[in-house]
Amino acid sequence: KHYIGLHNESTNKKAAKAAAFVCFKPATVYGGEFFIADGERIFRDLDPAVIKELYEKQVRISAVNLDLDVLGNLPGGFKETAMDKATELVDKTIIPKFDMDFELIWGTDGNDMRLQAIEEVQSPVNRHPDTGRPAWFCNMHNQARFLRDRRPCAVPEVGMTDIYFGDLSLIPGEMLSHVNKVCEDNIVHVPMKAGDVLLCDNYRVLHGRDIFEGDRLHAVSWFGDEKADVADTGGKPGDVLNNLLNTFLVGK
């Protein structure tokens, strides 16, 4: 059982303009409802002081945790050398599989022997490419560990995401709670039966999925892939972050 919070699909490199969500089979026991929210309404409803601070400080998303505590047992200079080699290995073999720019950093969350892949600094607000209107364009509701720890989450530690200010300082819990409340106040559940298709504007509409039990089969097709002018929030169409972690590990 895993709750997928509100998110857009994009990276600092690409963003899909639209998506078609298709239901082939609803959950056979219960749950699994698809839900959406209007990014313009979220932007409008957020406390202006919160928006101002997040916009000025920007945000960064940690996407992958590699716990390498075994290296901590090495003596003296061997430890530092091993950490450097581990960073180099991950940078050359794993990071290229992502169509994203990551910085590999040790110990951001206080665990000295944890190597994290952290996205570039990005804005929590974007302007729609056609209308020019501002909208909340941030995966905080889905990727903040503070929120994930307070709802059903089946993601293993290696894929446990988190979100920080642009300088990698912690975002206060009260700010995350406020964003969570505004997001959830704007959620609209979309019950779908087999054969239903939902078209969404990815620049304006965030989407997520409730917990479920039983078998469930949905799919999504992205179109209008283009370069993104504004740094985003967590995963391009079909990327490893949202589709590996949400689909293969927890069942999107």
Protein language model features and the residues they cover:
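Active-site environment of non-heme Fe oxygenases that use a 2-His-1-carboxylate facial triad
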Residues: 2-6, 14-197, 203-252
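Conserved donor-binding loop and adjoining core beta-sheet/short helix segment
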Residues: 10
